[in-house]
């Protein structure tokens, strides 16, 4: 009797779990999840990148742990177990940030702790990890975390560039070009206000849906 062939770790099916959230199933611009942090942490690019990586780590490993435990956790207490797993991972991530990137950790402040309530993390556990194998769940978590992070980075790129004239804290716009120095340019202070994050996300959604007819409402 021939043995069943094992599915490759990076089969086409598994790669779809990893790459799908970048476009067709993006948690922010398709599922409209995680919008609050898009407002809070995208004034500068560095905090946005750190937040994106933090959410990716938490989503990936919470998916993995809950997939491993899925057959041993009674349905009536699954939400409590999920919250405990997510909270433990968030605390670990928070301590790592304080140890290695303390200044960015101070900028993110309470928003790292609020990853516990991020609907993307809990949503992927409920929708995917509890019904799929650990490896697929891990890839799904990475994909959704990076898909979420991609939008944060895009929003932060435009807000920091046009709002502060810098990227990653390094000045891009030359001093001589500013009005105060006799030039013609001035930073757009409106980009630093939270509503601009919503407007930029709205523009991204518009561009994305205009290029993907399957997402357009009939």
PLM feature spans:
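Membrane-interface capping segments at transmembrane-helix boundaries
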Residues: 8, 207-218
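Short amphipathic alpha-helical coupling elements at transmembrane boundaries
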Residues: 20, 67-71, 75, 136-144
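Hydrophobic core segments of alpha-helical transmembrane domains in multi-pass membrane transport
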Residues: 35-39, 55-60, 87-94, 116-120, ...
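Structural signature of hydrophobic alpha-helical transmembrane segments
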Residues: 45-61, 81, 105-116
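C-terminal ends of transmembrane helices
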Residues: 62-75, 122-132
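Cytoplasmic-side transmembrane-helix entry/capping segments in multi-pass membrane proteins
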Residues: 73-86, 107-113, 140
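Transmembrane alpha-helix boundary signature
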Residues: 92-107
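Short, membrane-exposed interhelical loops at transmembrane-helix boundaries
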Residues: 168-190
